[in-house]
Each structure stands twice: as structure tokens, then as C-alpha cells.
Amino acid sequence: MNLQTATTSTLPQESVPAEARVILKGVSWSTFKALMADIGEDRSCRIAYDQGMLEIMVPYEQHEEPKILISSFVEALADELEIEIRQLGSLTLEREDLIRVVEPDTCFYIQNESKVRGKNINLQNVPPPDLAVESDYTHSSLNKFNIYASLGVPFKRNR
């Protein structure tokens, strides 16, 4: 298993970094699941797993601020347009058949809100979120766009 760590920020050196990341390579699905069971659901880190590569990221205060701003904007827009949305925060989006897992900073069901209303989210049985928000200050070794795309989260990259 290979290990990489990164703690960087776009702020000056004396500032607190926005996030810290650890990358583990060669992690089997069973090892990943055992680790997740050990650390539990109530944790401050976010995870992403892509076919043997595991990223554990600890967000700091600066990392959280854009998520809050974007969430407020989405909620205000939905209220103005009078549409129902369901915000689920840092929900674990998992597909064992694809060997992929990701936890966005926050996510929203907008178009598919009625399909998940009152349900526990299991991507085997319900559609993925319509919007996933990622606030990244450092470059991840994992391509989260590929993970989201494989899970079926709508994606459009502006070029």
C-alpha cells in the first residue's frame, strides 16, 4: 500500500490550511469497508474511494465556508422558484458494483427530489443527487469528476 499526504492552501504560509489529505493506494474493497466500519459515520473526515485508491480528507474552517455560501444560494434560488429540494450534506454516495464511493461537501436532490422524499439514500435503489458540491483548495490525486460521473451525478464541464 502506497501513502501520499498533502496539506496545502492558496493562503500565505502562516495561515491555517484549508484541508489535509491522505492518499492510500492498493486498498481492497474489504479493507476499505472494514476501515469505514471502524471509524463509523460520525466523523470529521470525508472519504473518496476509486477502485483501490482511498483518499481521506479533513476539511478545516476555510474549506467549509464556500459550501455554506453555495448551499444558501441553492436554497434561496429554490425558494424563489418555488421548487422542492432535499439537501443531504456530506452524504456517502456508494456503489459497491462500481467499487466507488465519494462524500461531497454537500449535495442536493432537485429534479429527483420527489423520488427520494422520505427515503434512505441507497444508489442501488434511487437516483444519485442532481447536484454535488465540492470545495477543493488542494488538488486531489483522485479524479472525483470520474467518480461522480460513474455514479450518475449529472456533470457538465465548461470549456
For every predicted segment, state its role.
Residues 1-159:
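Gly/Pro/Ser/Thr-rich low-complexity, intrinsically disordered segments predominantly at protein N-termini
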